[in-house]
């Protein structure tokens, strides 16, 4: 086809290139905006060039790994791990700090596995620089890293790394532990949800069971009731003392988590606490079928032992139980919990429509009927019952919600006054302000962990391995925040930003 005589700007001149050979041999001709011809020579293939290069100059000055190197010290790691290496026998071992750095790279950049981390370090210059390796140095195999953490290093090393980074942030005044936010998030387990078996397991004993039993028996004694024995587990009742669980045959320590109406999967749950600035200050890992309120005590004790100055403890509705409210208030701290709906049958009297008389310890219904305190059960519930004879001729019987015997039954917990105080705190302006911070603190931690650091699912199996995996992930997140904030607060940052327009990231080659 005959070429057009006129060419629009930005296209080749007439008699352009016919073949790839001519394209490589001849220069390019382009029209510029002023109508002139610009010659652009083809760039030479430099993939096989041999050069002397300064590796440090190739890593950008504002790279995350540079910031981490400025805030981290590794001497304590050498001292801690020295007993686990032999210095006078066998072949030279791999530097333990290098192995730990490889794991930090995995969690900092959300790489799913150590195998992929090893592959990326091979051809990523900044990762090699962070490890202290040259372009031709052999990277430690991923199996070496895995073996070190599974067999050689002590099991408490991950907790020590987590605590060390947290203490650094505290010493740099980056933490605000006066406000603690707690919640749990599920992590999909490495287990087929179709491979399971049903097992009967013992019910989990409650930490506060002994204290509750003593207070319940004191009330039952006043009411003339028989005390509840310590070994009363109702073993004679069907299913008493045990509960049937769905147990994975692949990873028995995970738990079946029901997500929505239909989705079911085996998972672990990371019960996490963070401060007002988003630093993770504590974590407990359980199976996915363990309720938040059951795992709360271990997490609360861990955080308050580390930060006794904690003043506000903020949680969602899953933690709104009498025991949690009592323990926090008895410790002199303030629980911040949300509103929860009252459970009652639609079309009947609301629970708050019954008036309580503390002097006589009874309730009065809207029609004036009295509900007396008859007993207190082993769960700590005070049972109030009406007189069936009085209720028989009541005109409001249809909206009362009485049982088949014609009695109206109400129940409150033995520690109900603590929940009432929590409700008063919830209505304060300060309480509303603090609870609104959940979305930018603990919820943000979970979002970053899953979207940026690959915590949505785990390849590890077993509670101990998943616990170490999550702690290292949270340690990396805290380290990243610590490094970034230290960089922002440094004088070098301000100098860098001042000259950033003329800063050119070009390698410096040796002459």
Where in the sequence are the language-model features?
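Anion-binding and metal-coordination hotspots
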Residues: 41, 110-122, 135-511
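A general alpha-helix detector
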Residues: 54, 98-104, 144, 148, ...
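Short, flexible loop/hinge motifs at secondary-structure junctions
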Residues: 20-51, 203, 212, 336
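Positively charged N-terminal leader segments that act as targeting/secretion signals
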Residues: 3-28, 506-507
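A Lys/Arg-rich helix-loop hairpin that forms a DNA/phosphate-binding surface
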Residues: 90-91, 132-138
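Basic, short loop/linker segments at the boundary and entry of helix-turn-helix/winged-helix-like folds
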Residues: 61-104, 109-110, 413
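Positively charged, structured surface patches that bind polyanionic biopolymers
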Residues: 36-72, 87
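Short amphipathic alpha-helical interface patches used for protein-protein assembly/oligomerization
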Residues: 127-131
């Amino acid at each position: 086809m005959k070429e057009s005589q006129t060419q629009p700007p930005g296209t080749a001149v007439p008699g352009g290139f016919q073949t790839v050979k001519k394209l490589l041999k001849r220069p390019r001709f382009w029209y510029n905006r002023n109508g002139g011809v610009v010659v652009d020579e083809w760039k030479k293939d430099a993939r096989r060039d041999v050069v002397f290069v300064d590796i440090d100059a190739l890593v950008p000055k504002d790279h995350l790994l540079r910031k981490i190197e400025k805030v981290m010290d590794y001497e304590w790691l050498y001292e801690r791990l020295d007993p686990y290496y032999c210095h006078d026998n066998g072949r030279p071992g791999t530097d333990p700090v290098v192995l730990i750095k490889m794991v930090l790279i995995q969690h900092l950049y959300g790489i799913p596995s150590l195998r992929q981390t090893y592959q990326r370090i091979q051809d990523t210059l900044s990762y090699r620089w962070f490890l202290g390796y040259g372009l031709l140095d052999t990277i430690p195999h991923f199996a070496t890293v895995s073996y070190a953490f599974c067999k050689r290093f002590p099991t408490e090393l991950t907790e020590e790394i987590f605590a060390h980074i947290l203490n650094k942030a505290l010493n740099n005044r980056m933490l605000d532990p006066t406000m603690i936010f707690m919640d749990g998030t599920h992590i999909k387990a490495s287990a087929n949800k179709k491979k399971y078996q049903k097992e009967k397991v013992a019910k989990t004993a409650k930490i506060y069971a002994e204290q509750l039993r003593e207070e319940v028996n004191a009330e039952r004694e006043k009411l003339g009731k028989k005390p509840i024995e310590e070994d009363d587990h109702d073993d004679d009742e069907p299913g008493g003392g045990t509960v049937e669980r769905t147990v994975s045959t692949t990873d028995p320590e995970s738990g079946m988590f029901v997500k929505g109406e239909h989705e079911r999967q085996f998972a672990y749950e990371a019960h996490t606490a963070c401060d007002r600035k988003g630093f993770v200050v504590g974590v407990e890992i359980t199976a996915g079928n363990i309720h938040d309120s059951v795992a709360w005590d271990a997490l609360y004790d861990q955080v308050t032992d580390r930060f006794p100055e904690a003043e506000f403890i903020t949680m969602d509705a899953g933690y709104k139980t009498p025991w949690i409210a009592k323990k926090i208030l008895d410790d002199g701290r303030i629980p911040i919990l949300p509103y929860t709906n009252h459970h009652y049958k639609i079309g009947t009297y609301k629970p708050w429509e019954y008036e309580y008389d503390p002097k006589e310890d009874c309730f009065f219904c809207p029609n004036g009927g009295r509900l007396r305190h008859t007993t207190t059960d082993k769960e700590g519930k005070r049972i109030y019952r009406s007189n069936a004879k009085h209720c028989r001729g009541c005109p409001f019987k249809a909206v009362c919600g009485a049982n088949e015997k014609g009695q109206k039954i109400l129940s409150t917990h033995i520690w109900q006054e603590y929940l009432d105080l929590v409700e008063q705190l919830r209505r304060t302006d300060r309480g509303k302000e603090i609870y609104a911070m959940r979305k930018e603190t603990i919820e943000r931690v979970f979002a970053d962990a899953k979207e940026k650091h690959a915590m949505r699912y785990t390849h590890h199996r077993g509670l101990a391995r998943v616990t170490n995996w999550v702690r290292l992930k949270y340690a990396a997140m805290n380290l990243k925040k610590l490094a970034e904030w230290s960089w922002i607060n440094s004088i070098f940052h301000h100098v860098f930003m001042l000259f950033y327009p003329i800063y050119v990231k070009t390698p410096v080659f040796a002459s």
